Structure formats: C-alpha cells, structure tokens
Amino acid sequence: FSDRPQRTSGTNRTQGVFDASGGGSPAPVRKEKKKAHRGLVWVLVLVAGAAIAAGSLLLLHTRQEKQAQLAAAQQAQVQEQQNQYGALMEQGTQLCETDPEQALGCFEQAQALYPEESAPYISYAYALYCAQDYERCISYIEDELGLGKAYDIEAQSQLSEILGAAYFECDDYAAAASFFRLSTAGGDITVNAQRDYAVSLGRLGDIDAADEILLQMYAAGASGDVTDYVQAEIDYAKKEYLDAESGFQAVLNQTQDIALQKRALRSLAEVYRDCAALVRTGSSPIGNPATKAVEVLANGIETYGLRYDSTIWEMLALAYFEAYHTDPSVPQSYLRKAGECFNRVLELGVTKSYLYSNLYTIYYELQEYDLAEQTLDAYAAQYPKDYEPYAFRAMLYITLENRKEQSARDYSAAVEAYETAGQLLRSDDDATYYQQLQSLIQQLQKEGWING
C-alpha cells in the first residue's frame, strides 16, 4: 500500500479539456466561432446600411431644403418684380396728367420688366398723347407697335382710340373718325372718344352720323356739359354760327372740366374766325367776330396758361390782323400785336412759310422796311428753294426806290431779286405773287426805268 496520488485520473482531465461533453474531437469549437463571426458581420452590415440610409435621407432632406429655399427666393424675386411693375404702372398713370415726360420713363422701365405685356406699351402711347407729341404718338403706334396687331382685340381697340385722339388733335378728322370706328371693335368706347368721334364726323360733313353718336352719348348718360359741347360742334359743322357761339359760351361758363373749357375756347375762336372771313362780304351773322376772337383768345392764354400753344398764338395773330382791318373801333396797335403774335409762333419752333409771308406783310404795312427785309432774310434761309421771299424782296426794293427822288432811283437790286424768283418758280407753285411782281416790272420797263 502506497500514499501517492493515483494516476488513473489523468485521462479524464485530458478529455475534459477537448470535449466538455465527453467527446475527443476539437472541430465543433471552430464551427461555433465561424457562426459568431458571421453574426457580427451581419450586425456590422446592418449598422452600416442604417448609417448609409440615414445619410441618404439627410442628403435628400438637405437637397429638398435647398430647393425649397431656392423656390422661395425665386418666388420672392418674382413677387418683387411684380410689385415693382405695378408701382411703375401706377406712378406712370398718375404722371400722365401732371408730367407726361416723366411718365414715359416709368412705362419704359415697366416694358423692360415684362416685355411681353401690352399694357406698358399702350400706356406709353397714351403718355405721348398727354405730352401733346401727337406726331410721335402716331408713328409709335403705327410703326413701332404695328397698330398693336400682335395684341388681343381689346388692346388693339385701346391703341385705336389713342390714335384717333392724336389724329383729332392734328385736325386730320378723316383718320380720327376711322380709328375711332375701329376702337369700337373691342366693346364700348370712352365718353371722350365718343365726343371726338362725333366732332370728327361733323367736321367731315357727316351730320347724321354725328347726331347718332350724340344720341348714344345721351343714352350712355354722358354729362350735360359734354353733350352741350358736342351739340355746339354739330351746330358749327352745320354753319349755324349763332347757335354754335351760344353753345360754346355756355360750356365755358358752366363746366368745371378745364380740358373741355380749352376745347370750347378753341372752337369758339374758330367760329369767330370763319365769321371774320364773311365780314368782308357783309354776310357774317355775328358782329365784329375778329374783335371777339381777340378777347376770347387773349383771355384764354392767361386763364388756361396757353403761352406755349402755338396754334392759339397763330389764331390770335390772325384775329388781331382781321380786327385791325374790319373793325374801325380797335386801337391802331392791333396790327403791331398781330406781328408780335406771329413772332411768338416762330419762337415756339413752328416753321411754316406763310408765317414769314404774313409777318412780312405786317411790317410792310407798318412801313417798318428794315424789319420786313430781315423777315425775308429769315424766310429765304429757312426755305431756300421757295420763290416767294425773292418776289417779296423785289416788291420791297421797288417800293423803296419809288420813295426816292427820280434821279436817285436804281431798280437793279429789284431786277436781280425778280430774276432769282423766276429761276426758283416751279410749275406746281402758286404764282400769284410772281405775277403781281411781273406786272410791276413790266410797268417799270414801259416807263423806261429798266431795260425790257
């Protein structure tokens, strides 16, 4: 018997190391590790996938947020542009009555913001009309806008109405009536357009059509002062001068519409002008119409601030001239005032040949021959191809020589001017003045003052 530990237990310990269940092979332990590794990989994959998904969602959200911000910015920009456009149109519309030149700038800016919109172009045309630049208004609508054919019927009608009004102010009543008629295609036209349409028809001699428009105005409820004005215009067209005179005077005394007062003033002056032409034949129904025209026009220039209205100044010049020659009661200064008014017309930039001839006639009659010759110098410089200034000059020189002693007379300058006038005379010219001069030259030839 021994006290050492027994060795038989070693085998059991070895088995326990390799197989807890009592088996001897190590392979089942490696399989479990692979399973655990695969599980860990799947967890990592799932985590990575979740991270990628979260990143994608974040990126999508950021992109959507940026798109929303961009859309909001674009919307704000569009809104700002619309607000700016609306403000420009409103400001321009208000300025049309007070400062149409500035209104043109507003409408140009509005056109730049929305070039496809018709409204700023129509408003620009209206501003030209308000600025009294009628020729420019007409060319803008007809040439630059092509009568608005690219726009809808309503826009075309508005442009036709403006065009009709511009032609009316240019005294082209046929064109005015034509475009006013076209403006009705877009529906009812404004009272102002009806007014000018009726007046245009009356001045064209179409009294029945003018009366029809007036009836439409009554039916539409047009104000009494406007219909009274149109009725007076129709009376004037019918040459019922007394009725026309009282009608225009009533409008001047009753209406508060300054624009209508100016129209009535001008038309009343035209009544007096036409009657002044009848005074010389003794057939004027109105006494001393030229003198009345002077009073109406001179007062109108002061009352309505018409110092820059060349047509009013021209009418006043003619009224002074006619009153001087037909009404013995007027001051002698009327003839000189006529000259001053014609000079005022020239100062305002109007260049018409008859203005120079009228002014020359006045200075000649006043025996202010130096001023008469200066007027002829300006006439010839402005119209170098016209024969009239040379014909007048020859007559003037003949007058000046006739005032001298016979021994001091020299008609050579008159003959030279006469020959120049003959060289410039064209077949389509009114040869009246040349024929008068020719008679004077022939008389001088007969008397031996000049060679035949």
Regions found by a protein language model. Give the residues of each.
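Canonical tetratricopeptide repeat
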Residues: S123, A155-I162, D196-V199, V230, ...
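Alpha-helical segment of the N-proximal tetratricopeptide repeat
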Residues: V78-L113, A277-G282
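Residue-level recognition of tetratricopeptide repeat
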Residues: T93, Y126, A165, V199, ...
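Start-of-helix register in tetratricopeptide repeats
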Residues: G86, A119, E154-Q158, N192, ...
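Register position in tetratricopeptide repeats
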Residues: E97, C130-A131, E169, R203-L204, ...
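Terminal, low-structured helical/coil segments at or just beyond the last alpha-helical repeat
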Residues: V415-G452
